[in-house]
Amino acid sequence: MALEKIIEKLENEKKVKIEELRKKREKEYEDFVAKKEKELEEWKEQQRKNLKESLNREESTLLSQLRLKYNTEKARIEAETVNRVKLLLLEKIKSLSNELYNGIWDGFVEKESVKGGEIILAKGEDKIDVDHFCKKYGLVLGKDRVEGKGGFVIQKDNLVIDLTIDTIVEELVNKNILEIAQILRGEK
């Protein structure tokens, strides 16, 4: 009987030890699973963060590209509009009556205080009263023509005064470019 009790006691101790080991292994397994789940969640969160940063960078790059494209197109349209304004202004000046047209050039020449020299007409010039300018300002008509849609150049010694329509319109636009840009952008 004593042997049976010893065997029974050993069996009980064995069951207790097995149960303790099972619980210990179960706890280790649960801890391992919890640790791995936590690592997985941290990895997922890091991947989300990386993806979000990557998307933000791509979005920022795309927005920058779109802004650049928009600003380039806007600048192109503004430049095209300014060129159209220049052409329209040139056409309006050329369509003035001969009296008004010559009066404009009289004003420019008087402003420059020209006395003497050579008047060289622009290739596109066909309305200037050359005789009037030659007599009034002591000018001599040059044989050649300069590039331009109208007007002329006065040359005396080393001095050249460019009074072509192209130059005058260009200077007028350049002088007022800020105001023109504000009008084009609807700021005025």
From Swiss-Prot:
The organism's place on the tree of life at top rank: Bacteria
InterPro entries in alphabetical order: ATPase_V1_Esu (IPR002842)
GO CC, any one term: proton-transporting two-sector ATPase complex, catalytic domain
GO function term, MF aspect, one: ATP binding
BP terms from Gene Ontology: proton motive force-driven plasma membrane ATP synthesis
UniProt keyword annotations, A-Z: ATP synthesis, Hydrogen ion transport, Ion transport, Transport
Alphabetical list of HAMAP family matching this protein: ATP_synth_E_arch (MF_00311)
Protein family membership: Belongs to the V-ATPase E subunit family.
Role according to the record: Produces ATP from ADP in the presence of a proton gradient across the membrane.
Protein's recorded name: V-type proton ATPase subunit E
